[in-house]
């Protein structure tokens, strides 16, 4: 679904300075080279100036220093990328589900429904649930007993908000995500006879303005809640284990795994496929490069990394063999230092 307006109207909505033809109608957002005469695009840096100069867009969002490079109409703003987000929202408004309960939904008799709630086909909402005003439960979604979906929130198709879990306002939980599955807790039985499941009686507490990607999982706490603070963004396939706390405004990219009882600070940026061990603390303002393995607490803000970059396979094989020889090399250097009365790093084994 698209919406149309003139470039001049768009400039007024954005608070942009118009340089060029403001009467042209626009109805879509596009890339610089994919834009035609009905589209708006954006340019954020000099790296994209060649594409800007070739663009056929009706208007382009640019900074003041790039206005002269725009072949057509320029919309001059301080931050073209943020302004472009607003353009997308204006020209491509997200369709909203109609208020009401679909006849195919199963809704317990004591569910508290706020004004304008929408419940889709085959959704199941169990006893004691509260749905905030303007919230949406998409087709096939499940909400367990006593859970709460906050005002203006959206639970996507086939997503689960398990019993006793709560969200704040304006939360988006995408398709297939599971909030409140049991945490991974087992106690070993005597004599190696197996494992006994530890009951998980905590919940999940999600703050305002959180977004959780498709097929992500946030496990309920063992005794107390797993907590996702306000403004957190979790990508698809992220896993947050039981008893964790993720600090406000932290962003975690796809495939990252956070083990139990770990606390991640506020305003952290965590790349994809990061593995974070259990029972540690990560300070506010930490950035972790994709594929980093975190095995201990990080107490100072800053950027951290530990991935192995790709290399030609023959080189990788040689380096792998050399890595297995490190212990022997260490012992040889240690013996040489000892024989010559030298004291060096090779003479000390350290675990840190």
From Swiss-Prot:
Enzyme class: transferase
Pfam family, one: Hexapep_2
Keyword match Lipid metabolism: yes
Enzyme Commission number(s): 2.3.1.191
GO BP terms, alphabetized: lipid A biosynthetic process
GO molecular function terms attached to this record: N-acyltransferase activity
Membership in a protein family: Belongs to the transferase hexapeptide repeat family. LpxD subfamily.
Record protein name field: UDP-3-O-acylglucosamine N-acyltransferase
């Amino acid at each position: 679904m698209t919406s149309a307006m003139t470039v001049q109207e768009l400039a007024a909505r954005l608070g942009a300075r118009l340089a060029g033809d403001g009467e042209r109608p626009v109805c879509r957002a596009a890339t610089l080279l994919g834009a035609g005469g009905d589209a708006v695009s954006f340019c954020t840096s000099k790296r994209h100036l060649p594409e800007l100069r070739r663009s056929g867009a009706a208007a382009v969002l640019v900074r003041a220093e790039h206005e002269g490079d725009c072949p057509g109409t320029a919309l001059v703003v301080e931050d073209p990328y943020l302004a472009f987000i607003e353009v997308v929202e204006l020209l491509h408004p997200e369709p909203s589900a109609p208020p009401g309960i679909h006849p195919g939904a199963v809704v317990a008799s004591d569910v508290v429904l706020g004004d304008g709630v929408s419940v889709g086909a085959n959704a199941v909402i169990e006893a004691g649930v509260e749905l905030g005003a303007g919230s949406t439960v998409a087709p096939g979604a499940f909400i367990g007993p006593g859970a709460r979906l906050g005002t203006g929130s959206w639970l996507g198709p086939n997503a689960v908000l398990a019993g006793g879990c709560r969200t704040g306002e304006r939360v988006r939980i995408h398709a297939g995500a599971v909030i409140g599955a049991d945490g991974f807790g087992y106690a070993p039985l005597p004599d190696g006879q197996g494992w006994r499941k530890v009951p998980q009686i905590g919940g999940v507490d999600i703050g305002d303005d959180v977004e959780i990607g498709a097929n992500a999982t946030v496990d309920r706490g063992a005794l107390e809640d797993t907590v996702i603070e306000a403004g957190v963004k979790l990508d698809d396939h992220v896993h947050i284990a039981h008893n964790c706390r993720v600090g406000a405004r932290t962003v975690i990219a796809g495939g990252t795994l956070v083990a139990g009882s770990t606390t991640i600070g506020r305003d952290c940026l965590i790349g994809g496929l990061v593995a974070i061990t259990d029972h540690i603390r990560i300070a506010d303002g930490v950035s972790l490069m994709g594929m980093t393995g975190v095995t201990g607490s990080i107490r100072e803000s800053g950027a951290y990394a530990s991935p192995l970059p790709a290399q030609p396979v023959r080189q990788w094989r040689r380096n792998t063999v050399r890595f297995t020889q490190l212990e022997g090399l260490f012992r040889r250097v240690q013996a040489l230092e000892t024989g010559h009365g030298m004291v060096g790093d090779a003479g000390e084994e350290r675990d840190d």
